[in-house]
């Protein structure tokens, strides 16, 4: 019983520490916007703010790859890839177009 209690408490403490060491993130896992250092900040503080702001903007605007990109030509069916001729018509381009 004492061994089980010791293992459980060690597991809970290690989980708690691991959660505390995670970087702070906002809603839906987005990073928090950096705080503006103020109008009277030193050039070093402004440079650090600029670096953090650039990283924040790049994180929010980076292109997303993966599942969303793969679902473009599936017709709503998972695991099925449709040819351009069987896809729903988008414009007036015929199926025998040389670029399709």
Swiss-Prot record:
Signal sequence range: 1-29
TM region positions: none
GO MF entries: G protein-coupled receptor binding; hormone activity
A single cellular component GO annotation: cytoplasm
Keywords tagged on the record: Amidation, Cleavage on pair of basic residues, Hormone, Secreted, Signal
Stored Gene3D superfamilies: 6.10.250.900
Top-level division of the source organism's lineage: Eukaryota
Alphabetized SMART domains for the sequence: PAH (SM00309)
Keyword Iron-sulfur: no
UniProt modification remark: No icosapeptide-like peptide is cleaved from the C-terminal.
Location of Tyrosine amide modifications: 65
Keyword Transmembrane included in the entry's annotation: no
PANTHER family, A to Z: NEUROPEPTIDE Y/PANCREATIC HORMONE/PEPTIDE YY, PANCREATIC POLYPEPTIDE PROHORMONE
Protein name: Pancreatic polypeptide prohormone
Organism: Mus musculus (Mouse)
Phylogenetic lineage: Eukaryota, Metazoa, Chordata, Craniata, Vertebrata
Gene assigned in the entry: Ppy
């Amino acid at each position: 019983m004492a061994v089980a209690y010791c293992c459980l408490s060690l597991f809970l403490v290690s989980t708690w520490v691991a959660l505390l060491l995670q970087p702070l993130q906002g809603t839906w896992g987005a990073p928090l916007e950096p705080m503006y250092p103020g109008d009277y900040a030193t050039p070093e503080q402004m440079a650090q703010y600029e670096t953090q702001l650039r990283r924040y903007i790049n994180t929010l605007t980076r292109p997303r790859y993966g599942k969303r990109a793969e679902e473009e030509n599936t017709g709503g069916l998972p695991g099925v890839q449709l040819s351009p001729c069987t896809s729903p018509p988008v414009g007036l381009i015929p199926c025998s177009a040389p670029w399709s």
